[in-house]
Regions:
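N-terminal non-catalytic structural scaffold regions of very large proteins
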Residues: 1-193
C-alpha cells in the first residue's frame, strides 16, 4: 500500500511540481513560501527517510513470515537443486516469453510503461562500445512469485530471476552492470495512464 500510494503521489503531486519548476523556478507557494524545486528537494529528503522505515518494516515482516514457513529468496541463497530448477524454469518458461531490446544511438529509446518493472543491463560489445539492454519483467502469462519445488514455502520473484540470467538473454555481450527499475510517469503527460 505504501509503495502504490507513493507512486501515485509522485505521478500527481511531484509531477505537477515538476511542471511548475519547468515553467518558472522563482514562484513561491503561498503556504510554505518555497519554490517547486525546493518542495521537490524536501519531498525527496522525506521519502528517503520514509523508505528507510518501509525497508525496516519489510525486513521485520519477512522474518515473521519465515516463522510461518514462508521465505522469499534470491538466487545466491537458493539450494543446488533449487538453482537447477530455476535455470530450467528460466530457459523453458521465461526466456521464450522475454522481449529484450537493445538501445543504440540509431534506435529510438523504447517506451517504458508506467509502474512496470524492467531489468536493465549495461552491455559491452566486442569492440568495447556500450549498449543498454532492457527486458520487461511483467508478463500476464507468468506469475510474479515463483514457488520453488519441495513444498517448503520458498519463493523467488520473477524479476530477480530475469536479472540473474540477463546475460544469457543478451548473448555475445559482456554484462558490465545490471539493475531493476520501475518508471513512474507524470500524470499530466502520461500517454498510458
Amino acid at each position: 500500500i505504501y509503495q502504490s500510494n507513493l507512486y501515485e503521489f509522485f505521478r500527481v503531486r511531484v509531477g505537477s511540481l515538476m511542471d511548475q519548476m519547468l515553467l518558472n523556478t522563482t514562484i513561491r507557494e503561498n503556504k510554505t513560501n518555497i519554490t517547486a524545486q525546493e518542495q521537490i528537494q524536501e519531498i525527496i529528503k522525506e521519502v528517503k527517510r520514509l523508505n528507510l522505515r518501509k525497508d525496516r518494516a519489510y525486513v521485520e515482516l519477512m522474518k515473521k513470515l519465515e516463522g510461518y514457513g514462508v521465505k522469499l529468496i534470491d538466487f545466491a541463497s537458493a539450494k543446488a537443486d533449487e538453482k537447477k530448477y530455476l535455470e530450467r524454469y528460466f530457459n523453458h518458461e521465461i526466456m521464450p516469453l522475454t522481449s529484450p531490446t537493445i538501445v543504440a544511438k540509431r534506435q529510438p529509446f523504447p517506451f517504458l510503461k508506467n509502474e512496470e518493472i524492467y531489468a536493465v543491463v549495461v552491455l559491452e560489445t566486442r569492440s568495447k562500445k556500450e549498449r543498454i539492454g532492457i527486458i520487461p519483467c511483467s508478463n500476464t502469462m507468468l506469475a510474479r512469485l515463483i514457488e520453488l519445488p519441495g513444498g517448503k514455502g520458498r519463493y523467488m520473484l520473477l524479476e530477480d530471476l530475469i536479472l540473474h540470467y540477463i546475460g544469457s538473454v543478451f548473448k555475445g555481450y559482456k554484462v558490465k552492470g545490471k539493475s531493476l527499475i520501475r518508471v513512474v510517469r507524470n500524470a499530466d503527460i502520461d500517454a498510458d495512464a
